[in-house]
């Protein structure tokens, strides 16, 4: 009898213990479910913020219109169903959640709405913060935690992402502008009433040896543009050393997103040993120090001039660029008056990528108008006769025409890798190996042929806005 009562008491105690344990187990299960909901929502919000920030950053080009477009792209990205509510619906981003600044680590007070940015030219970074959004995107209604406390009936979570551009597609080689004027007429009575355009002294359609120019003296002036240090300060010598500069010559980039009106650190001279790095663009990687992944060849590696049967000039140029001579050290194509015409081969190849342009005091909306090949005798007087284009000169420049192209073998090419974006400096510069220089503008030059020691031949194709050279948008935080 006593044993029976003792067994009943034990079963009762076990039932009580089981009930208590069951409550705890259910509590932990509820906690896991509710916390899992919060973690899942936070993951969705982070994906949403990352995507929206990247979409917005791609529109930031230093203009008010770019800021407006960035807001639109961020909202459009969030509205997509790819990252929100188990891919069942999009989210609505409010303006309060989208902010812009001039640096990814800017203090809270330096992040502004699109319409309140002090200087759109510097606003190259965007932050998407879902916790600032209206309505709230991170509020999660709990299923079990509310039973423990009314304060736990809803939980809030959020995510933040910062994206922007950290580079410029700018070659770390700088040269002197040949004049101080961004656009000026070239004196040539034979062309009247038409007038040829000069841009900082350079002529479109003419190839220059970029390592043999100096508008202020007989000795060549060329510089390393510091690819690592921010504009406005002279960086340490390691930043302009050959080993530091080499990968940026290969890629044609620098690691800052903007120059603006700031001065840049330049080092003279540009190292003579770095010329092979330019030739990766022609699929010549051996000995260049460049890798085929970060420095692929161009889709067209044919050098100009060449011996192909469809060569478009009636003469064979002496070199892949116009010859440089004199004091100041200029190409034979540069003197405007009272100059003895050069030999016909001295002009180098003409119009391989760009055509000479007609000057206009106001730049036409569609760009400057080109001259015709029939104008070559007036544009390029020479001895014994001016260079001439064959009747088969293509409607589009030879580089862009299939019959004048050679594709690389073994490596995948990237179009227009032969384009070099070169800072044009306000010269003369102060004496010394490391100085600060003002950038007048950025010239676009097309490599006509592989470089060699002391020779970097590139045809001028006009000026390019800095905002058009910003690197790819990157997720930074």
Question: Where do the model's predicted regions map?
Answer:
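Alpha-helical assembly-interface signal, strongest on the long, hydrophobic N-terminal helix that forms
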Residues: 1-80, 422
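Short amphipathic secondary-structure patches
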Residues: 2, 39, 43, 55-140, ...
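Generic detector of ordered, mature protein regions
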Residues: 27-29, 44-52, 58, 67-69, ...
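N-linked glycosylation sequons
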Residues: 109-122, 127, 137-477
């Amino acid at each position: 009898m006593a044993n029976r009562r003792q067994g009943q008491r034990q079963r009762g105690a076990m039932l009580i213990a089981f009930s208590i344990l069951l409550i705890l187990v259910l509590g932990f299960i509820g906690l896991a479910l509710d916390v899992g909901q919060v973690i899942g929502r936070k993951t969705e919000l982070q994906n949403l913020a990352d995507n929206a920030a990247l979409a917005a950053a791609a529109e930031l080009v230093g203009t008010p219109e770019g800021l407006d477009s960035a807001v639109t792209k961020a909202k459009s990205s969030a509205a997509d169903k790819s990252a929100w509510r188990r891919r069942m619906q999009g989210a609505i981003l409010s303006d309060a959640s989208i902010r812009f600044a001039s640096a990814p680590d800017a203090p809270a007070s330096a992040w502004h709405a699109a319409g309140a940015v002090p200087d759109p030219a510097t606003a190259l970074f965007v932050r998407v913060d879902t916790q600032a959004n209206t309505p709230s995107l991170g509020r999660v209604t709990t299923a079990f935690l509310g039973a423990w406390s009314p304060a736990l009936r809803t939980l809030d979570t959020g995510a933040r992402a910062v994206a922007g551009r950290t580079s410029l597609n700018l070659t770390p080689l700088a040269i002197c502008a040949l004049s101080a004027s961004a656009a000026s007429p070239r004196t040539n009575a034979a062309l009247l009433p038409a007038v040829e355009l000069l841009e900082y002294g350079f002529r479109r359609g003419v190839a220059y040896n970029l390592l043999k120019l100096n508008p202020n003296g007989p000795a060549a002036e060329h510089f390393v543009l510091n690819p690592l240090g921010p504009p406005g300060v002279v960086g340490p010598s390691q930043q302009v050393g050959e080993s530091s500069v080499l990968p940026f010559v290969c890629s044609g980039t620098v690691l800052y997103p903007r120059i603006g009106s700031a001065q840049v650190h330049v080092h003279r001279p540009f190292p003579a040993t770095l010329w092979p790095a330019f030739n990766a663009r022609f699929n010549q990687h051996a000995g260049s120090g460049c890798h085929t992944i970060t420095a692929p060849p161009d889709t067209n590696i044919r050098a100009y001039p060449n011996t192909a049967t469809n060569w478009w000039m009636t003469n064979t140029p002496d070199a892949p660029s116009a010859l440089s001579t004199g004091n100041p050290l200029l190409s034979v194509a540069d003197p405007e008056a009272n100059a003895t015409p050069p030999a016909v081969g001295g002009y180098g190849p003409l119009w391989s990528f760009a055509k000479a342009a007609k000057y206009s005091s106001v730049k036409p909306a569609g760009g400057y108008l080109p001259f015709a090949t029939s104008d070559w005798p007036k544009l390029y007087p020479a001895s014994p006769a001016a260079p001439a284009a064959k009747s088969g000169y293509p409607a589009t420049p030879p580089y862009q025409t299939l019959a004048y192209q050679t594709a690389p073998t073994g490596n995948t090419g990237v179009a227009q890798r032969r384009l070099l974006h070169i800072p044009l400096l306000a010269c003369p510069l102060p004496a010394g190996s490391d100085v600060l220089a003002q950038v007048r503008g950025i010239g676009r030059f097309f490599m006509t042929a592989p470089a060699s020691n002391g020779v970097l031949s590139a045809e001028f194709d006009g000026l390019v806005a800095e905002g058009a050279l910003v690197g790819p948008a990157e997720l930074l935080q």
